[in-house]
Amino acid sequence: MVIMQHEKMNDERNLTMNSTKVILKDASYLHSKTSITFILKGVVIEEDNKIYYFDTSATFEDQEVEFEFALFDSDMDNLKHIEYDNPVTEIYFIEPDLHFTIIDFNQELLCIYIDFDSGLRHSNMATESGISLRINVAKSDFTKFINELASLH
């Protein structure tokens, strides 16, 4: 299930903007309480790059991990043109805080691993090690989620 909400908000630079919340929920969310949420905080232009800053949270049962995440123009362009490689597709971003591993078992649901780099989160050193959050979703829901994120570009 994908949810997109718009809210009016002020960011730390005292600019008023419409906040956009994009949520991807596990197909069994009522039981697993597993989801990832991106809330657009602001957009900044630095050195000819447009950077989209998000407050991001991942939930699993009664646990929640919150962090700031940045997507660059090129990340957004890549999301708009994503192509699936069977059976495994990887989506990486310039900021290595997280990436997606998509596994298509040719069944009703995709298996999405959202991989968090704990080395980067704790020591500002990319390590490609950390926790992964597994979300099972219909391919149409994941495509809608990616399109909602990319539409912010």
Residue map of PLM features:
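Beta-strand elements of well-folded, non-transmembrane domains
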Residues: G42-V44, A58-D62, L71-D75, F116-L120, ...
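N-terminal domain-start interaction segment
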Residues: V2, H6, N10-V65
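Short, surface-exposed secondary-structure junctions/capping segments
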Residues: H81-E90, I146-H153
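Charged, amphipathic alpha-helical segments
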Residues: S32-K41, Y84, Y92-D97
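Short, well-structured hydrophobic secondary-structure segments
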Residues: N49-V88
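Intrinsic disorder/low-complexity signal
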Residues: H6, N10-D11, K25, I103, ...
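Mixed-charge, glycine-accented linear interaction segment located at domain edges/termini
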Residues: L120-H153
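Amphipathic protein-protein interaction modules
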Residues: P87-S129
